[in-house]
From Swiss-Prot:
Protein family: Belongs to the archaeal Rpo10/eukaryotic RPB10 RNA polymerase subunit family.
Keywords: Cytoplasm, DNA-directed RNA polymerase, Metal-binding, Nucleotidyltransferase, Transcription, Transferase, Zinc
Chain sites annotated for binding Zn(2+): 7, 10, 44-45
EC class: transferase
Organism the protein comes from: Pyrobaculum calidifontis (strain DSM 21063 / JCM 11548 / VA1)
Pfam families: RNA_pol_N
Subunit structure: Part of the RNA polymerase complex.
Cofactor: Zn(2+)
Cofactor note: Binds 1 zinc ion.
Stated name of the protein: DNA-directed RNA polymerase subunit Rpo10
Catalytic activity: RNA(n) + a ribonucleoside 5'-triphosphate = RNA(n+1) + diphosphate
Primary localisation category: cytoplasm
Reported function: DNA-dependent RNA polymerase (RNAP) catalyzes the transcription of DNA into RNA using the four ribonucleoside triphosphates as substrates.
Enzyme Commission code(s) on record: 2.7.7.6
Length: 66
């Protein structure tokens, strides 16, 4: 799905942090430490970033029939 632009609960802007978060976690850093360093301290915001799953590449494989 589309990267969350804002936290679903509190509305804090998060879209600008997702690329940095993903890059650092894939490089092997601990997700909690990355979120702390990015200033994401609320549980709701942390959940929004950590639970996001990118499905768009998987969905583009399927053909829509009309």
């Amino acid at each position: 799905m589309i990267i969350p632009v804002r936290c679903f609960t509190c509305g804090k802007p998060l879209g600008h942090l997702y690329a940095v978060f993903k890059k650092r976690v894939l490089a092997g850093e601990h997700p909690g430490r990355v979120l702390d360093e990015l200033g994401v301290v609320r549980y709701c915001c942390r959940r929004t970033l950590m639970a996001h799953v990118e499905w768009i590449d998987d969905l583009l494989v399927y053909e829509r029939r009309g």
